[in-house]
Swiss-Prot record:
Its main location: membrane. The lineage of its organism: Bacteria, Bacillati, Cyanobacteriota, Cyanophyceae, Synechococcales. PANTHER family: MAGNESIUM TRANSPORTER YHID-RELATED, PROTEIN MGTC. This is Protein SrpB. GO terms for cellular component: plasma membrane. It is found in: Cell membrane.
Length: 182
């Protein structure tokens, strides 16, 4: 049996896909909301559920030809990816540089935009019935959002520590290093 296609009237299967897409979106959204990001739990839940709904329409409208349904599904997934890309683009902001010396503008919202995009993909995957892949993708998304942030903090602390040591080495008087020889 094909995993993607459900028998007509399988409301339990359809409900499971929608509910799981909602849960995945809510979990990712909660992660973003706790970090004070511009898009939160409701936004991510709606994106995941909307993507699942969009891909479920051609799946349910299979009709006589599964080839036609797969073709329609392919176009639907492309449309969802492009549409959500525009939604994410609205979250990306370009601001004035922190200092005039750097001259480079600050960009914010990229991670939120990318997270909305991946949440739409997860909703589409779950809507297609590939819920195991959706859960694995959710795990790796949360790992990226939470785990990589910790790694960045550790790297930043290490850099700061190295800068402090280098600064102290420059500010020590020249004979301070020789006093320890006694």
């Amino acid at each position: 049996m094909n995993v993607i296609f459900l028998p007509q009237g399988d409301w339990l299967g359809l409900s499971f896909r929608l509910l799981l897409a909602m849960l995945v979106g809510a979990v990712i959204g909660l992660n973003r909301q706790r970090g004070g990001r511009p898009a939160g739990m409701r936004t991510f839940t709606l994106v995941a559920m909307g993507s699942a709904l969009f891909v479920m329409v051609p799946i349910q409208a299979e009709g006589d030809s599964s080839f036609a349904a797969i073709n329609a599904l392919s176009r639907t997934v492309q449309g969802v990816a492009a549409g959500v890309g525009f939604l994410g683009a609205g979250l990306i902001l370009q601001r004035a540089p922190k200092t005039k010396r750097s001259g480079r503008p600050r960009v914010s919202g990229l991670t939120t935009a990318a997270t909305i995009w991946i949440t739409a993909a997860l909703g589409a995957v779950i809507g297609c019935g590939l819920w195991q892949l959706g859960l694995i993708g959710t795990f790796f998304t949360l790992l990226t959002l939470s785990g990589f942030k910790r790694l960045q903090r550790i790297a930043w602390l290490r850099q700061s520590w190295e800068r402090l040591i280098a600064w102290e080495a420059k500010t020590l008087p020249p004979d301070a290093e020789e006093e320890d020889d006694d």
